Amino acid sequence: MNKVYLANAFSINMLTKFPTKVVIDKIDRLEFCENIDNEDIINSIGHDSTIQLINSLCGTTFQKNRVEIKLEKEDKLYVVQISQRLEEGKILTLEEILKLYESGKVQFFEIIVD
């Protein structure tokens, strides 16, 4: 059975087999929220403000859950990502991450291992 994950980043270290193909699509908030509202999704986000942002935007009830992701063929990964580099060690508050979202600096992606 294919797995579906939620994360705040994508890394090559998540891939288990090489060579491999990965399809990355930028999606809007609505599509992101529809796809993560799934009881089988494996949440791997370990940042309070990111979880609060997702719950606020999508009406979900995720909790922090810092787990390792290992993607297999046909697995999906939904990513919420800040599109600007933060100061080293910066931990965002909910207000700060909401401000980034409102200014278009938070993006959503669907990643599929092909």
Curated annotation (Swiss-Prot):
Coiled coil: none annotated. It comes from the Viruses. Pfam families: STIV_B116-like (PF08960). InterPro entries: STIV_B116-like, STIV_B116-like_sf. This is Uncharacterized protein 114. Signal peptide: none annotated. SUPFAM superfamilies: STIV B116-like.
